[in-house]
Amino acid sequence: MKGEGKVFLKSRMKWIGLLGLVLSAFSLLVHFLLAGFTDDSISDYSIPVTIFSWRPIFDNPRFARHTPLYRRLWGPTRHVETLLPDANPRGFHSDPPARTNGFVFVRIQGGFHEIRNSIPDVVAVSRLLNATLVIPEIQSTTSSKGISSQFKSFAYLYNEEHFMATIANDVRVVKTLPKNLKWARRKKQIPSFKVSYGSSPYYYLHHVLPVLIKHSVVELVVPHGGCLQAILPSDLEEYQRLRCRVAFHGLQFRKEVQELSTKVLQRLRPLGRPFIAYDPGMTREALAYHGCAELFQDVHTELIQHKRAWMIKRGIVKGKLSVDSAEQRLAGLCPLMPEEVGILLRAYGYSWDTIIYVAGGEVFGGQRTLIPLHGMFENVVDRTSLSTSWELAKMYGREAKHNDIKKMTPPSIEVETKHDSLKSTRQRPQPLPPPPARPKYYNIEGWWGWVAESDNEPESTVIELRTNAHKLLWEAIDYVVSVEADVFISGFDRDGKGHPSFASLVMGHRLYQSASAKTFRPDRKQIAMLLEEIRDHMYEANHTWITSVRKLLKRSILEGLMESSKRSKAFSFLSHPVPECSCITRTHPVSNATNLGVTHRCPQWVDGAVSERLKEYKNAEKEEDLDEEDLSSSGLFFGHKESGGNNNGNNETVNSEANNKEEGQLEDQEELEGSER
């Protein structure tokens, strides 16, 4: 009986185990089916960044939008809400004639901001010369071998068809030269002009136009990011609006770039939270031009100094090789470091879980310079953390594979064998000379390694040329994100030639598209002086210093706009396209927009579209701009929210009540000062 009971028990356990396996398999099958059918619907409600390296970390997922603190940090800029974009022709505007004086073929050199600044100038020059414009050739793509043959030159970055349709009523435009002129260009038989930065209309009418009429074609080489002076005479004001139509409406990125930019924007707004776009402006060329090498250490200083020596040799820089970087920084001529920008943002009131998007291409010094910013803000991201490699590959197109990347490997160790004569004799050989020095292959690894071996910078490899073309697409994504950001701040707005840079174009586009969008234009000289006051204790700022920073940053929104009209516009019209490309509403004409020189009234149909928004602004002005839950004491300045649940939050509210009245008076005083200006 006992044996039969054991056998029965074993067989029963086997059946139970088998049943468990069947149920497990059935459960897995059901889960897979449910996942397959519900994948599309669930993706609409889930945070779209779960497959990326960035995991958003928030103190409180619920983000209150109707508080005074939100309006101060993220709300629209007051007093310029009546400023609206208007780049349409005013008065009589003639279409381009059927017969022109000839063809203008343009080759544009430089990076993203130089290309974008040059194209509107080229279109304006073509209309000025009554010429047919050939789609401009972008040197950064034509010289880069190995890029996708699907996109060439202008079409590698922008949408050709949209560009041609936008300017069809202004300039005749064709994709290529006629066959006979194309052959002459290949033989270098057409006249060519290397145009200087900011050339005057007089230059084109008296030097280029006669040659164009004689030869029916001219080639313009634009090497410096702009071929027409920024400020034109009053009788050529329509050419300024033509520039705006080209830059802000005609230059649309190609479909693949636009789609990825939209995806990045969607992934940047988890749970509908706002974000800051930050452009460090720290390029090697800009640092060398302005003499900021001593802000860095070791090899980075050598690289900057080498570039400055190269600029001096070619006449780009007129100063000395060795410059006191500390004096340059105090004079506001060097970029604000990411750590300093982080301190300013925290002092203004942005919390540790604020989303910050780092834009503007590569940051000189690498990710090491961004470590302090990551330490102050948890959600610091860029395009690499918001896109996948296959999405970037799709944007690049199908590219040829190159095997010219030769990895530096240690030299082979040759095993020396004794000669037969030494083996046969018993005589002790003479001491051998010391072996030759081991090649310092470890010193020349990396893109900077040539500094240790040579005074001459090596020529770019095929892969480096292709990467330069990719950088145009990377900055295109950054440009779209920066223009659409809730807040924008830059560490520097000058390039390696002293001209307005990527950040300047972004600020100009934001001013045109939405003048009330919050854009900080900090005075670097005043910021440097404030930072010097706490240089020895930067993370223990007191309430007085924080108040000074807030006043300075708040003034930079409007006063920086006024300063930009004097400083940046003289070099680049697109960095400040006001008042030529703006209008002011008829129902609410009184604002700081009139101080910017805007007197043209918008069409009547525009007033109805903005009336509701203006009511919201007025209601916001009636409330005190208090900093609720604002950690303004030095002890909590850079601290994350401590554990303690609601009790801690209540304590912060109680502690902040004493400061609310004082800060409310400060904000009211600033509003009065702003209205007086």
UniProtKB/Swiss-Prot annotation:
Its EC number is 2.4.1.-. Keywords: Carbohydrate metabolism, Fucose metabolism, Glycoprotein, Glycosyltransferase, Membrane, Signal-anchor, Transferase, Transmembrane, Transmembrane helix. Pfam families: O-FucT. Residues 622-631, 665-677 have a biased composition (Acidic residues). Glycans are attached at residues 130, 542, 592, 651. The chain crosses the membrane at residues 15-35. Its main location: membrane. It is an enzyme of class 2 (transferase). GO terms for cellular component: endosome; Golgi apparatus; Golgi trans cisterna; membrane; trans-Golgi network. Residues 644-658 have a biased composition (Low complexity). Residues 410-437, 619-677 are annotated as: Disordered. Coiled coil: none annotated. The keyword Transmembrane helix applies. It comes from the Eukaryota. One of its GO terms (molecular function) is glycosyltransferase activity. It is found in: Membrane. One of its GO terms (biological process) is fucose metabolic process. It is a single-pass type II membrane protein. Pathway: Glycan metabolism. Belongs to the glycosyltransferase GT106 family. This is O-fucosyltransferase 27. It comes from Arabidopsis thaliana. The gene is OFUT27.
